[in-house]
Every structure is written in C-alpha cells, then in structure tokens.
Amino acid sequence: MTKVKICGLSTKEAVETAVSAGADYIGFVFAPSKRQVTLEEAAELAKLIPADVKKVGVFVSPSRVELLEAIDKVGLDLVQVHGQVADDLFENLPCASIQAVQVDGNGHVPNSQADYLLFDAPVAGSGQPFDWGQLDTTGLAQPFFIAGGLNEDNVVKAIQHFTPYAVDVSSGVETDGQKDHEKIRRFIERVKNGISRTK
C-alpha cells in the first residue's frame, strides 16, 4: 500500500484531520515559506501525532546543527532536505533522511546518502506537476516519494505510473492557500482505496 505524506501543516485542526484520515507522514516546513512553522510550534503540534505516524521536518540547504536541533526539539522521525546537501549531512543522524530532487528535464538522479529520495517539481510547493516522462526510477537504490502538483484527481495515475513508496502533497490539499480538511480526507482516501476503484 502506497504511503501518504501530508506536508505544510501548521494548525491543530489540520494535523488532527490528517492523522484521523490515515496519513502515514506529517510534514512541518521549517524553511521560509507561507507554510513555515517554528520549532516551538511544531513541537506543540507533534504532541497530537501518534507514534505510528511519522513526523518529517522540511529544510532548504540546512546545516547539520540546524537538523540536529530540530530533531531534538520536535522529536522528528525524518528530515527532508531541499537545495544544497553537504556530503556528510546525513551521516549518523539520529533519524532517517529524505533528499528532495527537482525533476527539471535532465533526468539526473543524484547519488545520495539519504534513506529516501523525493522527486518534486522544479518549483516546490507551486502546485505544478513535473513531466512524469522525464523521470526514470528504474534501479533506484532507495525507496522514493513522488511530489509536485499532486491532488485527488491525479494521484492514482501517479501511483500507477511510478509505483512509489509514498506520495507527498501540500498545495493539492489547500483552498485559497489554507489546508482544506475535506481535501485532505479525499486525497488520503483516494490513495488508500483508489487503485482498486479505477481498475
């Protein structure tokens, strides 16, 4: 069964909705963006998340010190890194790691030390999907997430195309820039039940 990550959550209600609907991963954005939360805010929201739902911190070009501080303060289960990744960034971290890769048409997949890869659109959080035909996941060493412009209407097709470990959504479950609780529920339901329903 494909796992689901709901990213960019910043309110108690959105976290509770995602958890009750069956999300496997909850993402907190620490990089500057309209979805950014502080470590203190994330730590409070993390108290609402049961142990079987994994907490992910999202960073852009962080230092190792930044990662370790967030892991400690929030109790993160994974760190997701966009942008520049130092060679030793993921070494001996006390949690798992995800390296984000922007699919920009050159088909290049980096040789990464991360535990997972996440394939995203050239502009993360834009709501625009990348050209799925530009990405060949054959022979990848790591399990991978598919992100970038996913929503309840295209996520089943994405799963059928890539057979990913997980799918990741943020703007695809928003209305007017805010997390939409019904869209969160429908997205997760589509992932968990949608494959059989479309065949």
Swiss-Prot record:
Classification via InterPro entries: Aldolase_TIM, PRAI_dom, RibuloseP-bd_barrel, TrpF_fam
SUPFAM superfamilies: Ribulose-phoshate binding barrel
Annotated EC: 5.3.1.24
Reaction equations catalysed: N-(5-phospho-beta-D-ribosyl)anthranilate = 1-(2-carboxyphenylamino)-1-deoxy-D-ribulose 5-phosphate
Enzyme class: isomerase
Tagged with keyword Isomerase: yes
Keyword DNA damage: no
Keyword field: Amino-acid biosynthesis, Aromatic amino acid biosynthesis, Isomerase, Tryptophan biosynthesis
GO-annotated molecular function: phosphoribosylanthranilate isomerase activity
UniProt-listed GO biological process terms: L-tryptophan biosynthetic process
Pathways per UniProt: Amino-acid biosynthesis; L-tryptophan biosynthesis; L-tryptophan from chorismate: step 3/5
Superkingdom, taxonomy of origin: Bacteria
Cited Pfam families: PRAI
PANTHER family in UniProt: N-(5'-PHOSPHORIBOSYL)ANTHRANILATE ISOMERASE (PTHR42894:SF1)
Family: Belongs to the TrpF family.
The protein's name in its UniProt record: N-(5'-phosphoribosyl)anthranilate isomerase
Organism: Streptococcus pneumoniae serotype 2 (strain D39 / NCTC 7466)
